[in-house]
Amino acid sequence: MESLAHLPGIFLPLAGCVLALSLTTIVYRTVTNPLSHIPGPQISKWSSLIEQYYWFAGTKVEYVDYLHRKYGPIVRVTPTEVDICDLPAVREIHRVRGGYLKSEWYKSLTPPGVTSLLTLIEPAQYSEWRRLLAGPLSDTSLGKVEPMVTNHVHATIDRIASDLQSQGVSDLYKWWTYMATDVVSELSFGEPIGLLARPKETAWVMDYLDKVGIMHAWRTTFPFVFVLGRFMPVHPFKHAIQAIGLLGKWARQSIQQYRQHIQEQPESPKPTLFTKLFKTGKFDDFQLTYLAGSYITAGSHTTAVTLLYLIYAICSDNEVRQKLLAEIRTLPENFRHDELRHLPYLNQVITETLRKYAVVSSALPRVVPAGGATLAGYYLPGGTTVSTQAYTLHRNEAIFPNPEKFDPSRWESPTQDMKDAYMPFGGASRMCIGNSLALMEIRLTTTLFLRRFPEVHMSRQNGMRDEDLAQEQYLIMAPRGQRLLVEA
């Protein structure tokens, strides 16, 4: 018992030694880390806290862009991640069969046991899924659904006109989101969710879409929040999680209805984005339900936000407006989408919108292949997470002079560097399969909307201001004010 009395006196020196040894180990590992020679702030060598702070604030892309302007084309963002905006290095990272696989970070975007095209890492599995999913979204296949898309566009513009007549203003963020959601849901299952026809009954969809960005931030950083949320009386995403449940219920019902439709018409079922998936028999209803949700997220929000910023840019520049209107007036009354594909200025306006207001402009993390690689003049060992972000690439002054100016004419004769740095739909090896659908919706909507409302302008009612259009950047970008009120 007497020996135990001496323990307090022994414990303090022992604890001090353990602490000193731990700190020494941390310092040694930090100093000898193979990324220690990469430029960047000192905090990036020790912790991810600063990066996580900006990620949750929706301003990480601006923080990383600031680091590039201060430190150069390659910067250390966290102890294990670097970001690169050097164009030759970006080409190498996103080269088809280049060996730079997606990082494990993507898997944190989905619940355990669930896979989507976005989160697939292995190239062979991704190629198999892409073959099944991309066919209905090709330019050729989309020609068959053009009448359906056009009908939704007309219905949306009628809703906007009704708002303008009764209230004097209309919120384009709301209506573009409703339209794009109905389009992608009908393409997925043959029937739309019904936001345009029943906006009050389906308002829960907006509860989900409005929170999807910050929910991704929480899921990728603190996934346990969603697990514990089921047992918490108060939860920051209560309404969004309820909306996810309603979305899942709608998707399951739609899947069952489509299965019955296939049984009734096995030789000629109504084609949808999921028709081939049904035929393979490899996807259960749980997986299909999640895919439906991911399609609606990716296919609605991105298109709606792009349209919102396109109209905002036109409202802000009368020269752009008049030049675009003059081109649109050359179209016949009953034009087709193919004719819009060949309108030079319309497509320059769209391309410039996607440059300055890219909806997916945050980091695209990849993993350096085994054996390491030299990128932007620095050696990176295999396994290093290396990211690129369109936000910085699209603002490279050497490639895009005066990058903050909305200038569609810069795309009259684009250089090869402009084409390579332009990444609104992701890198070449994993480019979004829905880009053709998005462009069809954007071309048709822009043209038909401006034909109906050539004098549209941003409203100043209800406190609407330019600051509402500040970009909030998570996995996908959205206007911080989540609205664009217009008058016409």
From Swiss-Prot:
Listed Pfam families: p450
Binding site for heme: C432
Alphabetical list of Gene3D superfamilies matching this protein: Cytochrome P450
Enzymatic class: oxidoreductase
Keyword Acetylation: no
Gene Ontology CC annotation, any one: membrane
Keywords: Heme, Iron, Membrane, Metal-binding, Monooxygenase, Oxidoreductase, Transmembrane, Transmembrane helix
Membrane topology according to the record: Single-pass membrane protein
Keyword check for NAD: no
Compartments where located: Membrane
Purpose of the protein: Cytochrome P450 monooxygenase; part of the gene cluster that mediates the biosynthesis of nigerpyrone and its derivatives carbonarone A and pestalamide A. The biosynthesis pathway begins with the polyketide assembly by epaA to form phenylacetyl triketide precursor from successive condensation of two malonyl-CoA, presumably with one phenylacetyl-CoA starter unit produced by the phenylacetyl-CoA ligase epaB. For the nigerpyrone biosynthesis, the reactive polyketide chain is released as an aldehyde through the R-domain. A nonenzymatic cyclization and dehydration may create nigerpyrone.
Pathway(s) it belongs to: Secondary metabolite biosynthesis
InterPro entries: Cyt_P450, Cyt_P450_E_grp-I, Cyt_P450_sf, Cytochrome_P450_monoxygenase
Top-level taxonomic group: Eukaryota
Cofactor(s) listed: heme
Annotated protein name in UniProt: Cytochrome P450 monooxygenase orf2
GO molecular function, one term: monooxygenase activity
Enzyme nomenclature, EC number: 1.-.-.-
Family of the protein in this entry: Belongs to the cytochrome P450 family.
Transmembrane domains' residue ranges: 7-27
PANTHER family: CYTOCHROME P450, CYTOCHROME P450 MONOOXYGENASE STCB-RELATED
